[in-house]
């Protein structure tokens, strides 16, 4: 989860988020090198006497500044396309959870179970217990097994919403009349917080998401107690 005054990304909890963080560092390094080169050239122009001001044609230079940006764009595009493919690929999910956005709460349905469904509302500030997080706690958490691929089907009952959990690298739009899907895989147990990430009305800020990732045995016990 996020911490006060945090400047970086949240700690990665899923393979997808780890790949996204690596891609972020890779792209940022390229941007830093390009910025350094541009600043160096500008400093040279400002501190040295200008030469070749009347040059009308320089094919060698034009070739370089055409090919070099193309190579840089390819170096950025290839890992990006790889991650996009990984995010869309779902191989044999062990569980499917249907998520519906409402104004202003989420509802969840475990489609592999006959009667396992519930609504998830934010806990008001006045009802919080010591140690709980303001605007992030819910009355019903989404309990899921860790280290297993889980398919999330995401849609909306009314307006546009967006189901997002940053530490898992998840952000999927909830669109009325359309079913989007995302893959959830957690490397370790814990509580992972998210929020609606699409402006959806006056209480948009009061639609938190809480995933509780537990070992498979604990999940089986929880699901048996809920049915």
From Swiss-Prot:
Catalytic activity entry: 4 Fe(II)-[cytochrome c] + O2 + 8 H(+)(in) = 4 Fe(III)-[cytochrome c] + 2 H2O + 4 H(+)(out)
Membrane topology label: Multi-pass membrane protein
Subcellular location: Mitochondrion inner membrane
Cofactor note: Binds a dinuclear copper A center per subunit.
Transmembrane intervals: 15-45, 60-87
GO terms, molecular function: copper ion binding; cytochrome-c oxidase activity
Cofactor(s) required for function per UniProt: Cu cation
BP GO terms, sorted: ATP synthesis coupled electron transport
Lineage top rank: taxon: Eukaryota
Disulfide cysteine pairs (residue numbers): none
Sequence positions that bind Cu cation A2: 196, 198, 200, 204
Keywords of this entry: Copper, Electron transport, Magnesium, Membrane, Metal-binding, Mitochondrion, Mitochondrion inner membrane, Respiratory chain, Translocase, Transmembrane, Transmembrane helix, Transport
Residues where Cu cation A1 binds: 161, 196, 200, 207
Mitochondrial intermembrane compartment spans: 1-14, 88-227
Side Mitochondrial matrix, residues: 46-59
UniProt-annotated binding residues for Mg(2+): 198
EC id: 7.1.1.9
Physiological role: Component of the cytochrome c oxidase, the last enzyme in the mitochondrial electron transport chain which drives oxidative phosphorylation. The respiratory chain contains 3 multisubunit complexes succinate dehydrogenase (complex II, CII), ubiquinol-cytochrome c oxidoreductase (cytochrome b-c1 complex, complex III, CIII) and cytochrome c oxidase (complex IV, CIV), that cooperate to transfer electrons derived from NADH and succinate to molecular oxygen, creating an electrochemical gradient over the inner membrane that drives transmembrane transport and the ATP synthase.
Family annotation (NCBIfam families): CoxB
Family, per entry: Belongs to the cytochrome c oxidase subunit 2 family.
Xref: PANTHER family: CYTOCHROME C OXIDASE SUBUNIT 2 (PTHR22888:SF9), CYTOCHROME C OXIDASE, SUBUNIT II (PTHR22888)
UniProt protein name: Cytochrome c oxidase subunit 2
Source organism (scientific name): Maxomys bartelsii (Bartels's Javan maxomys)
Lineage: Eukaryota, Metazoa, Chordata, Craniata, Vertebrata
